[in-house]
């Protein structure tokens, strides 16, 4: 284990870095011109990994849209959950799929910035595939959701209001950082209205790039921005040769999450145990253990449990299928059924044993997105005319996604005490749950039900960092 990984294991309960990038290549009718009419780019990269600033919700809604911002937010979250499970199903369909971990929120936000420039069949394909049923209202809805998430995020204090100056405050902190940026080729005729929309609703600053002359140097610059935005967890989102001289625009989203459990695991209770992988092989893993009171559900063919993070507004929900039922339960999960799991959770107390795990996942998502229905948005014939002053605009070439997750015992005493104070009613039921077999998990924002991350662990032995 590297020195950095060891340090973070001591310092964090859960650290998650996630990034997505959509690279667009120019086509003949949208090639760079002499710069006339093009939006004026900035020369300074927006490389501070700060939270995306919220914008005020748009007060007027088009005909057929939800009647209030709250309904608009609900519709966005529901569409994103449906896309999350569709994407997960497509990724695990690959023969070599093992442990998978993605951020549907990150992928959706990067593609939403791209969607803002789409027209015609490309716009229709993206709207259907990504669950953007709000149409143009998708953009203020994302700003509204990000404003909600900004309310959860603190970077300088734990639940006890610490100063952030000592190690304990760092451990106790809840941190949720989201950053967006656009990297556009100098002289390409990007429409000012498009850049203004992305900046207003996503905080995506425009950075001038020179892909034609030195795309490799620009790749390294973008990767450095992503690394900074994910606390160095994602260091090479765009692989070598991932960009080319025909690249005209790269849209990036990075999300970094760190938090402690409200109810911590005692490291002294962690012991080696056997985890049986999906293929039936066994491996020895460090199994954490605690007796706790939390929300739990006994479902047909599975059990589910919720573990809140510091503050109680963001949590991890784990779905543990019965032995031999993993593939069946996984195949049945959809946006509505996942929300059904959330609704089924209720107050309970009992014993929980779950493995420590840490792993990385990366994927080039173009093929998966095309298979899900987005083919019209890829290639030189795609219609992104709303992105440029003249011509058809660039088409999507690649969508890169990389993720890191680390979960262990660390938490805070103050958070655990707060959790006890919040519980007043008697337990509805009891449980005894051991995650010694494949399981699914997500990290969700409880007030909005937004699914920030979704993954599966089918081989805990290979997920030990």
Predicted feature descriptions by range:
Residues 2-19:
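N-terminal secretory signal peptides and thylakoid transit peptides that target proteins
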Residues 40-78:
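N-terminal low-complexity, Pro/Thr/Ser-rich intrinsically disordered segments
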Residues 59-71, 105-109, 121-129, 199-209, ...:
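Acidic/histidine-rich, surface-exposed loop or edge segments in extracytoplasmic proteins
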Residues 116-155, 269, 273-279:
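Active-site-surrounding "flap" and adjacent substrate/cofactor-binding loops of secreted or lumenal enzymes
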Residues 150-314, 347-424:
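Non-catalytic, conformational "gating/processing" segments within enzyme and secreted inhibitor domains
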Residues 251, 306-312, 317, 422-465:
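Extended hydrophobic
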Residues 314, 321-345:
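Internal alpha/beta scaffold segment
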């Amino acid at each position: 284990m590297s020195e950095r990984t060891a340090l973070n294991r001591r310092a964090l309960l859960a650290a998650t870095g996630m990034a997505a990038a959509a690279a667009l290549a120019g086509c003949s009718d949208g090639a760079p011109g002499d710069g006339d009419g093009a939006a004026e780019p900035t020369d300074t990269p927006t490389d501070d990994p700060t939270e995306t600033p919220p914008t005020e919700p748009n007060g007027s809604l088009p005909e057929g849209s939800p009647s209030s911002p709250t309904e608009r937010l609900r519709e966005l979250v529901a569409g994103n959950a449906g896309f999350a499970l569709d994407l997960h199903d497509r990724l695990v369909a690959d023969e070599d799929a093992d442990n998978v971990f993605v951020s549907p929120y990150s992928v959706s936000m990067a593609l939403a910035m791209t969607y803002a420039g789409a027209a015609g069949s490309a716009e229709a394909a993206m709207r259907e595939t990504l669950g953007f049923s709000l149409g143009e209202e998708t953009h203020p809805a994302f700003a509204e959701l990000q404003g909600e998430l900004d309310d959860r995020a603190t970077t300088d204090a734990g639940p006890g209001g610490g100063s952030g100056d000592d190690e304990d405050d760092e451990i106790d902190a809840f941190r949720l950082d989201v950053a967006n940026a656009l990297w556009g080729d100098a002289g390409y005729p990007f429409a000012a209205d498009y850049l203004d929309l992305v900046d207003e609703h996503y905080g995506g600053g425009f950075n001038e790039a020179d892909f034609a002359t030195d795309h490799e140097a620009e790749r390294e610059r973008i990767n450095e921005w992503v690394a900074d935005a994910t606390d160095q967890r994602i260091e090479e989102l765009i692989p070598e040769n991932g960009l080319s001289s025909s690249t005209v625009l790269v849209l990036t989203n990075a999300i970094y999450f760190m938090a402690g459990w409200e109810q911590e695991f005692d490291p002294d209770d962690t012991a080696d145990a056997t985890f049986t992988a999906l293929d039936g092989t066994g491996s020895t893993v460090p199994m954490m253990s605690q007796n706790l009171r939390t929300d739990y559900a006994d479902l047909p063919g599975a059990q589910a449990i919720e573990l809140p993070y510091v503050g109680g507004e963001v949590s991890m929900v784990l779905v543990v299928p019965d032995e031999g039922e993993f593939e069946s339960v996984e195949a049945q999960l959809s946006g509505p059924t996942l929300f059904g799991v959330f609704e089924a959770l209720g107050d309970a107390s009992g014993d929980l044993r779950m493995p420590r795990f840490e792993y990385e996942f990366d994927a080039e998502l173009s093929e998966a997105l095309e298979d899900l229905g987005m083919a019209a948005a890829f290639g030189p014939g795609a219609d992104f005319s709303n992105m440029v002053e003249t011509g058809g605009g660039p088409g999507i070439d690649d969508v890169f996604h990389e993720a890191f997750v680390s979960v262990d015992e660390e938490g805070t005493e103050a958070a655990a005490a707060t959790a006890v104070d919040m519980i007043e009613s008697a337990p509805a039921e009891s449980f005894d749950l051991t995650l010694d077999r494949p399981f699914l998990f997500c990290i969700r924002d409880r007030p909005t039900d937004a699914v920030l991350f979704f993954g599966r662990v089918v081989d805990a032995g290979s997920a030990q960092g």
